Amino acid sequence: MNTALTRFRPLIPAGGVGSRLWPLSRAHAPKFLLDLTSSGNSLLRDTYDRLIDLSNGSVMVVTGTSHANAVTQQIPELRAADLVLEPSPKDSAAAIGLACAIIHRREPDAIIGSFAADHVISPVDEFQRVVTEAVITAATGKIVTIGITPTEPSSAFGYIHASESLGIEGAPNTHAVDTFVEKPDTTTAQKYLNSGEYTWNAGMFVAPAALMLKHLEANEPELYAGIMEIANAWDTPEREAVMERVWETLPKTAIDYAVAEPAAAAGDVAMVPGSFSWDDVGDFDAVARLNSEKSGEQLTILGEKDNVINHGCSGIVVANTERKISIIGLDDIVVVDTPDALLVAPRSKAQAVKDAVGEVKARGLNNLL
């Protein structure tokens, strides 16, 4: 094993509801706890399994207190010391920053890696090779992001513009990062795709914990002070009291704003291209595509397959009740049947599910969220 890997401590921020996957994904059963690819595992479990072999048996999960039981049921071997529970959502900088601070307090020379709980990645061995290259690069004193080669001019992701190769032994594909670009419009995204100089920012990064905290202190001093106070009490009897007093005072901000973008401007960020298949499973169109690619079938059925009567339809049906669902002669449909809500839409409008959720909120139907 490369010596840098002995310092590697991955963490998984497991948050967010996934509103474009409503009514299947809810606050009490969010996207990352679901099996959306018919693998037999949740997205969280698959993420954990990809990382555990690289980590000397220690992967930290950061999630909301309401998901603690579900997380430990899905990952029964997760150590209590590796489960960080947030009393309320505070965005990615607080979640990742606190995990980073706890790891750094325990192991000052640790290299952390942050990987979202709800992505689909294959093949696993290629992902692990890329992460190893990122860890080797991070050991030289860099924050390393993993850039995904764009397959379309998407306006749903941020972009990374890289420059010269850094020539790091053991990490031949590493490049310096010039800038992070916010989610562009479709025309600009097409220009990025045509240039071949940009990769998608998938929110995966590897870095020395000390370097992450250095940039967090410089750019978000109030947030830094709060998470350090919590981290210093974490492995003591004072944890709950300090968490209760400090957590709600922390400012909300994303890790890209708090660390990645200013670190790139300071020349501290590198990029390793992700030469693997990646999908953030952002809507039901993605769920249908991923399952169809695996099964070769035109209609994906999640849930109770015997409850679906299909006559020449394609798309996706989620059958989460005992009700029988009969569909006839419809192409590229989305049907999601749950005990208290039913969604019907064409796959082409899968992104608009978020608008439907907005209407549910506006009507005060919080029990459906």
Residues covered by each model-derived region:
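Conserved core of the sugar-phosphate nucleotidyltransferase
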Residues: 124-246, 268, 346-347
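Left-handed beta-helix
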Residues: 2-7, 209-211, 215-369
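Short coil/turn connectors at secondary-structure junctions
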Residues: 6-8, 56-57, 79-80, 107-110, ...
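A short acidic, often aromatic-flanked loop/helix-cap motif at beta-alpha or helix-coil junctions
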Residues: 89-94, 152-154, 186-188, 278-279
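Residues that recognize and position ribonucleotide moieties
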Residues: 113, 205, 280
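Residue-level signal for inorganic ion chemistry
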Residues: 44, 99, 118, 160, ...
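Conserved beta-strand scaffold positions in the cores of enzyme catalytic domains, especially
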Residues: 33, 83, 143-145, 268-271
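Conserved N-terminal catalytic core of the sugar/cofactor nucleotidyltransferase
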Residues: 1-13, 19-27, 32, 37-126, ...
